[in-house]
Every structure is written in C-alpha cells, then in structure tokens.
Amino acid sequence: MRIPFPLCLPLVLAACAGTPPAPAVPDNLKPPAGESLVSVLRARGVQIYECRAKKDDPAALEWAFVAPEAELFDTNGKPVGRHGAGPHWEAADGSKIVGTVKARADAPQAGAIPWLLLTARSVAGDGTFSRVTSVQRVATVGGVAPADGCSSAALGKTGRVAYTADYVMYAPK
C-alpha cells in the first residue's frame, strides 16, 4: 500500500519533533518576553491535603493543601525527575529549582487544580534545570481537595488526590 506524500509529511514531521510547542495560556500565565521554551515535562502523582482548621475561621474545618508529590516524565514517557514541596523540581542529574507562584488561572477542565506561572527563586546544580527561570503548570487533571470527609474525627489526617499536569520550563534566550 502506498500513502501519498502529502499525507505522510505530517507523520514524518511529528516523529522528528522534539519539544512540543508551548500550550495556549491566558496572558497572565505567559513567561517573560526574554525567555524561550526548553522542555515540557509530564507529572503524574498526588496533591496532598490535611484536614485542619481554617485560618480565617478556626471553628470550621477544611482540606488544606500541603504539598505535591509527583514523578516527572519527558515527552517519550521516560522518568526524568521528581516534583515536590516548595514547590521544587529535581532532575535525575541533581539539578533543582524551587519556585514561587507568580500568577494563577482556573483550569479549563472542572475538577482540576489551577494552572500556574512560577518563577525560580533558587536554582542548584548543573544540568537539566540549571538555566530554568520560569515554569508553567498547565493541562491539569484532578488534584483538587476532597469535597467532604474533613470532620473533627479526621482532624490532622491527610488525603492524597491523584493528578497529572504538564510543567513547561523556560530559560533566558
């Protein structure tokens, strides 16, 4: 069977593609103009919550965010690092960044944690993440705090909610 060349071209180009293009995001989540895309990593893990008193109303209880725990994968599905509290991203080569949330936007999908733009507040080690200055969290699925179950009987207990997201890394041009 022969496939006409015009139909083959998109398949060939897709097979040769490296880093996927940056996703479409709201303006407040765009990285600074002097930065360019360096990698897109897929995270698969959990968002951890603790049942505790609300800060603004100690008589009421809520599931409060504690930290993420996720494994990071490249576009081929190969494990390349971990994501955790801080928030931080640590590559298998030992390079690590710790971020600060700069902007957020509701996820387009209901029941998903927000999309974020973070800036690197510290960078350690030489390697994969050593030049990263901004990180977007996009394409989120799941991860929101449980809707119920936080009661006086559950006070201090933790809940782990599965999530996936893409972490899009940017560095100076």
Q: Residues of each region from the PLM?
A:
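Bacterial N-terminal signal peptides that target proteins for export
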Residues: 1-7
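C-terminal motif of bacterial Sec signal peptides marking the signal peptidase cleavage site
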Residues: 14-15
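Short, conserved catalytic or interaction motifs in soluble domains
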Residues: 18
